[in-house]
């Protein structure tokens, strides 16, 4: 590359781009396996010593990733020409990835006593160092003034979801999208996102009641404080007066498509809890077939995440202040129609949600906000891993409250019942969730003939801490016996 006829700045920029992608590659490997072989140069096909070496320490790999990201942050250019679409690599993309990575690594080291890929204690306590690196990256990006939250107060009931369904998000949301996948019909770069969201083979996505309970009321107070028996609040009532993002993330009463001409109720036949996602789902139902080519751009890193990364790192460092809150959590909540209230005590529901292991009021509120704002953006799994909350994956699923079995329900608010929960093997015009004897997976109601949907109770799910990293594939160890297996696998 250095032989190219270009200025030193341009050469450094493209080396930064290359090192950005190398860092991204190794971040994925680190988060999957922990310790992996690290290579800083290309390998000759005859160099068997390099090809068949063992795993480098997780801490070495982590440090090398940070080196690459620091180089990219320093040398990738921030010229406007690299930012005229949100799909190019530039300085701020590198800063955003550095912030995301350093938050992961800092909290991973804080909450995990041992390196999961060795089962042994970390050789050095570097959690604070990584959290401070996250703060520095966020501050540089935030202070640049290049990015902001997309917020039109008149459109707050729809604008959140529109970011994920816009035909030209890379252009329309350049102020918030730091990096995105730029789909294009003319170039044949498309995907069938609608089909994944509504097709009977794919559309089994569903949120749990435990998570939906974390959405605040519009007045900024917890839903779980307003209702003492919060799990028994009927569906229409629990969707009323909530954070605007709720109705832009799941099907709630009044949800329509096709320009408002068709009502779409939660389909319990497929989305078993009743909390069926709509984020990413386009308005035009004629595009729901698996052959439909859709080109809505998909954000990979948004400015909202940078604010959340900053808030979380500051909270974890014990440095959350009202000034930090007002720059991060407050604007996110106000954009969602929620009054911002600076916390004075920990919400008992959030303490319980995170297994009574976290009691810091700021950490808990940042986690609440992160879950709501970044839902379905591919970050939650790694969040649960780094927080050492793997037991959440084995927590029983809880769905919407059903007042009575065999009684047709109107879940979309058009006054016409369309949903039925029954233990009878029957064919009906309704969308049906079969329970008890009619349900092979063991779907039930929590109180027998009424109560919360309890999907797939016959499915046994257990958590073991060795699952914080994935197993090294057996075929890889067969090919290279110098590779060790992760503990427990």
Residue ranges and their predicted role:
Residues 1-192, 221-228, 233-489:
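Acidic/polar-rich alpha-helix caps and helix-coil junctions
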Residues 186-213, 377:
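Acidic-aromatic pocket-rim loops
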Residues 208-222, 241:
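Segments forming glycine/polar-rich beta-alpha architectures that bind adenosine-containing cofactors
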